[in-house]
Amino acid sequence: MRTLWIVAVCLIGVEGSLLEFGMMILGETGKNPLTSYSFYGCYCGVGGKGTPKDATDRCCFVHDCCYGNLPDCSPKTDRYKYHRENGAIVCGKGTSCENRICECDRAAAICFRKNLKTYNYIYRNYPDFLCKKESEKC
């Protein structure tokens, strides 16, 4: 519970669905979303280019692609509701955009959990200049 409170305090200044996404990540992985995923590999965090470094980074690549398929939505600022049923993330009722954004975030949080065993600390705070190649196609 203490960790949840600390993450919530850290995310107070975060806009829109990034808050919900962070809470999903915490719930699925037990990891602090800011320190564990914000600057991981070539795709976790702002932007992205090159080849994903591992399965966790590929989760972020797929998440970026998912957001890219929502041209009429604002994934980083539109808020949505979700809850958990028997431990599973369930996106709540909302607009079409809110539901699709929630589903993108849900899939990424689950992907992070499924790849916890291969999470590699050498990719935390990974330098952007090492991600030189053109981005893969979604």
UniProtKB/Swiss-Prot annotation:
Any Gene Ontology CC annotation: extracellular region
Q: Hey, where's the site called Putative membrane binding site on this chain? A: 18-19, 34-35, 39, 46, 76-77, 79, 82, 124-125, 129
Outcome reported for the amino acid change (mutating residue 93 to R): Is 1.5-fold less toxic than wild-type AtxA, and is similarly enzymatically active on anionic POPG vesicles and 1.4-fold less active on zwitterionic POPC vesicles
Mutagenesis or variant effect for residue 114 to N: Is 30-fold less toxic than wild-type AtxA, has 3-fold higher enzymatic activity, has 20-fold lower activity in inhibiting prothrombinase activity, and has 4.5-fold lower binding affinity to CaM
Give the UniProt record's GO annotations in the biological process aspect. Answer: arachidonate secretion; lipid catabolic process; negative regulation of T cell proliferation; phospholipid metabolic process
For this UniProt record, the keywords arranged alphabetically read as follows: Blood coagulation cascade inhibiting toxin, Calcium, Disulfide bond, Hemostasis impairing toxin, Host cytoplasm, Hydrolase, Lipid degradation, Lipid metabolism, Metal-binding, Neurotoxin, Presynaptic neurotoxin, Secreted, Signal, Toxin
UniProt key word Ribonucleoprotein: no
EC numbers listed for it are 3.1.1.4
Q: What is the effect of changing residue 79 to E?
A: Is 4-fold less toxic than wild-type AtxA, has 2.5-fold lower enzymatic activity on anionic POPG vesicles and 6-fold on zwitterionic POPC vesicles, and has 8.5-fold lower activity in inhibiting prothrombinase activity
Q: In which tissues is it expressed?
A: Expressed by the venom gland.
Effect seen on changing residue 39 to Y = Is 16-fold less toxic than wild-type AtxA, is similarly enzymatically active on anionic POPG vesicles and on zwitterionic POPC vesicles
Task: Name the principal localization, coarsely classed.
Answer: secreted
Among InterPro entries, the record links this protein to: PLipase_A2 (IPR001211), PLipase_A2_Asp_AS (IPR033112), PLipase_A2_dom (IPR016090), PLipase_A2_dom_sf (IPR036444), PLipase_A2_His_AS (IPR033113)
Reactions mediated catalytically: a 1,2-diacyl-sn-glycero-3-phosphocholine + H2O = a 1-acyl-sn-glycero-3-phosphocholine + a fatty acid + H(+)
Q: Where in the cell is it found?
A: Secreted; Host cytoplasm, Host cytosol
Q: Outcome of altering residue 93 to G?
A: Is 1.6-fold less toxic than wild-type AtxA, and has 1.1-fold lower enzymatic activity on anionic POPG vesicles and 1.7-fold on zwitterionic POPC vesicles
Q: Which residues bind Ca(2+)?
A: 43, 45, 47, 64
Q: Which domain of life is it from?
A: Eukaryota
> Which cofactor(s) are needed, names only?
Ca(2+)
Q: Does the keyword Signal apply?
A: yes
Q: So what does mutating residue 39 to A actually do?
A: Is 4-fold less toxic than wild-type AtxA, is similarly enzymatically active on anionic POPG vesicles and 3.2-fold less active on zwitterionic POPC vesicles
Q: What is the effect of changing residue 79 to K?
A: Is 2.4-fold less toxic than wild-type AtxA, and has 1.6-fold lower enzymatic activity on anionic POPG vesicles and 1.6-fold on zwitterionic POPC vesicles
Remaining remarks: Negative results: does not affect mKv1.1/KCNA1, rKv1.2/KCNA2, mKv1.3/KCNA3, hKv1.5/KCNA5 and mKv3.1/KCNC1 voltage-gated potassium channels.
Kindly give the PANTHER family that the UniProt entry links to this protein. Answer: PHOSPHOLIPASE A2 FAMILY MEMBER, PHOSPHOLIPASE A2, MEMBRANE ASSOCIATED
The protein's name is Basic phospholipase A2 ammodytoxin A
Task: Print the organism lineage.
Answer: Eukaryota, Metazoa, Chordata, Craniata, Vertebrata
